[in-house]
């Protein structure tokens, strides 16, 4: 690996100081394009604000700016929303622009807008000319079917529409093609049943009920029963227990059982034997039911999980379920079952750092100290949470293995001369990240392997840190900690650390994991900014800490985000008795969830972390612990002690407020 990446192993951070070069070429480009960039941003903003077309006033400098086509595309999109008498010209402009930039990222957004406009206006001939199957969305594909139907070009179309029909979700853009399929007698009961099953298999009950209505009356019963089992699993299963002769689709029965096991494992446990007996299921046939219940019990830290795992046939285990059997055994301190579960995993899974660590823990508990030591030592060079845990078990300190990717100025300059990379940089500087990523991907695809490695440094020099880290991951460059663990927000982090009385390394660890340094990051849950705070959480924290009430835009301010994020973390640390892994889990999953996960009595921290039910949260805690170690090592240049990682997770008495919160919160469950 070292030869391929031309990495330099360094015993100290000082040895690589001279290697941390910033792209001189990028700085020169930044200066040379400054005026044109400002003109572009101003003009682009005026288009977004729906100002009239001002292209006649564009300067030659603006026209020669690499992003000028993006301004042209924006103006054409604006024209496509213009008055009816101007649309013919807009259509021609759009068609000409797309033809001139057929393969370029700049045409993608315009093509989508053009197709949408043509579909709304039923300009089907132009639609077919502009449509490309490659990269088309489901909606655009449906619109293309409509175009062919309206133009009478239906040869071979039925098979394509039938394939599109087989989706488990609503596709309103395909209403016309599906109606055409039905009118031509091609929407058969078999096709309808297949779509109903697809919807039911993913739990999309409301949509399944809509499609069920299209079935012949004598065919709806089994599917309505399936839907009812998903909506009301406990009542439906009780009916099937009370009426052993009542027919039920085997997939519907298992789906209803799985839904009950996940939402109410206690109720499922009470009914397991009765259901198996009533339906006449042999031990072999009952195995999937035992597995569904065992998994849910394991996610809920119920020791009965192991009893049901014992009822599962070996053929029904996969790596994911074996992992949860191992976790349940680890939590129950049944190290023999834990070891057996690890041995049963696939070779690839068994050799991961996670399961080598737990194999070592099991060996130690089963008094095979030599095997435990061998496995622990095999982990030490892995540089991750498990290697640090192994070091703690061996009473050793941790020094991350620094492998530096040295800069090659010739390659760096060659990368920045690639037109797509130049556009990517300018788009990034203009805050157009989605477009910047598309141009980066185009440019990256044209690079040599050596250039791709150096492109990590290019992105980092641009301060596009999340992209640098993403490319480094793709190139398997994990250990250039100087490059991949920057500290661009030291002023803000230090201020937040003083306020919340936290170590800066802890704040940086959370910041890196939450946003990868993206000031403008927005999650699917509408968490925003460097520390990924939702507005209500930020305002509640500000009120508690007597800080100004933030608006939504304030969450993108680095100082506000780091300060309120650190304050939130401090509040969670205080709530959970200073236990960092618990507070981190609460920062990610919410305090109410973590209250449910707290042990009734003290448990080893590695055991508790491994049994966090949400895979995202488990990985989140583990990665941040490693990030904190790395940031602290970079700052202090000292070997890091991890013996504190072994401190048990202590039970914390629940308050009345905790109990009220638990009563009002649905338990999101699922393996991970």
Task: Give short role names for the model-derived ranges.
Residues 11-22:
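Bacterial N-terminal signal peptides
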Residues 26-74, 80-83, 400-421, 429:
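N-terminal leader/linker segments that initiate helical-solenoid repeat arrays
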Residues 49, 82, 121, 151-152, ...:
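Structural motif corresponding to the intra-repeat A-B loop/turn of tetratricopeptide repeats
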Residues 64, 73, 270, 274-277, ...:
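Catalytic glycan-binding domains that act on GlcNAc-containing polysaccharides
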């Amino acid at each position: 690996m070292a030869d391929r990446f031309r990495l330099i192993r360094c015993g100290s951070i000082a040895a690589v100081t001279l290697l941390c070069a910033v792209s001189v070429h990028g700085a020169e480009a930044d200066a040379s394009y400054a005026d044109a960039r400002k003109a572009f941003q101003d003009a682009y903003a005026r288009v977004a604000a729906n100002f009239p077309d001002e292209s006649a006033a564009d300067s030659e400098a603006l026209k020669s700016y690499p992003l000028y086509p993006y301004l042209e595309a924006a103006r054409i999109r604006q024209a496509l929303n213009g008055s009816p008498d101007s649309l013919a010209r807009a259509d021609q402009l759009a068609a000409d622009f797309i033809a001139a930039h057929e393969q370029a990222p700049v045409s993608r957004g315009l093509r989508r807008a053009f197709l949408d406009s043509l579909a709304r206006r039923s300009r089907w001939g132009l639609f077919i000319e502009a449509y490309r199957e490659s990269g088309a969305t489901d909606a655009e594909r449906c619109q293309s079917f409509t175009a062919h139907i309206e133009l009478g070009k239906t040869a071979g179309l039925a098979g394509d529409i039938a394939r599109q029909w087989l989706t488990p979700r609503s596709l309103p853009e395909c209403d016309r093609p599906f109606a055409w399929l039905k009118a031509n007698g091609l929407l058969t009961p078999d096709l309808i049943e297949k779509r109903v099953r697809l919807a039911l298999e993913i739990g999309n009950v409301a949509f399944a009920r809509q499609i069920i209505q299209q079935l012949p009356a004598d065919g709806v019963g089994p599917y309505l029963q399936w839907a009812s089992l998903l909506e009301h699993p406990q009542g439906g299963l009780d009916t099937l227990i009370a009426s052993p002769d009542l027919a039920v689709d085997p997939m519907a029965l298992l789906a209803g059982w799985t839904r009950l096991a996940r939402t109410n494992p206690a109720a499922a446990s009470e009914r397991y034997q009765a259901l198996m007996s009533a339906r006449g299921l042999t031990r072999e046939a009952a195995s999937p039911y035992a597995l569904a219940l065992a998994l849910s019990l394991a996610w809920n830290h119920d020791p009965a999980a192991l009893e049901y795992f014992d009822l599962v046939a070996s053929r029904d285990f996969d790596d994911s379920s074996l992992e949860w059997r191992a976790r349940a055994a680890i939590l129950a301190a049944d190290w023999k079952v834990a070891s057996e579960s690890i041995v049963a995993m696939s070779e690839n899974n068994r050799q991961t750092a996670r399961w080598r660590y737990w194999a070592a823990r099991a060996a130690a508990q089963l008094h095979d100290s030599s095997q435990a030591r061998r496995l622990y030592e095999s982990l030490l060079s892995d540089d991750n949470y498990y290697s640090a845990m192994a070091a703690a078990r061996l009473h050793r300190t941790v020094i991350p293995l620094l492998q530096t990717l040295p800069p090659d100025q010739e390659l760096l300059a060659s990368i920045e001369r690639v037109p797509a990379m130049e556009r990517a940089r300018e788009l990034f500087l203009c805050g157009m990240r989605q477009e910047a990523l598309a141009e980066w991907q185009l440019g990256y695809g044209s690079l040599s392997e050596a250039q791709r490695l150096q492109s990590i440094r290019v992105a980092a020099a641009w301060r596009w840190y999340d992209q640098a880290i993403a490319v480094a991951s793709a190139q398997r460059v994990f250990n250039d900690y100087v490059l991949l663990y920057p500290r661009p927000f030291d002023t803000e982090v230090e201020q937040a650390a003083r306020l919340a009385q936290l170590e800066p390394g802890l704040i940086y660890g959370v910041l890196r994991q939450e946003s990868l340094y993206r000031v403008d990051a927005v999650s699917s849950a509408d968490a925003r900014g460097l520390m990924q705070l939702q507005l209500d959480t930020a305002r509640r924290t500000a009120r508690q800490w007597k800080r100004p009430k933030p608006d939504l835009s304030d969450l993108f301010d680095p100082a506000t985000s780091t300060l309120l994020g650190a304050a939130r973390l401090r509040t969670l640390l205080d709530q959970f008795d200073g236990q960092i892994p618990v507070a981190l889990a609460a920062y990610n999953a919410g305090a109410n969830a973590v209250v449910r996960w707290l042990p009734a009595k003290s448990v080893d921290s590695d055991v508790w972390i491994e049994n966090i039910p949400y895979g995202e949260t488990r990985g989140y805690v583990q990665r941040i612990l490693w990030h904190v170690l790395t940031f602290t090592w970079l700052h202090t240049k000292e070997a890091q002690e991890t013996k504190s990682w072994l401190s048990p997770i202590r039970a914390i008495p629940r308050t009345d407020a905790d109990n009220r919160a638990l009563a009002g919160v649905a338990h999101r469950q699922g393996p991970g």
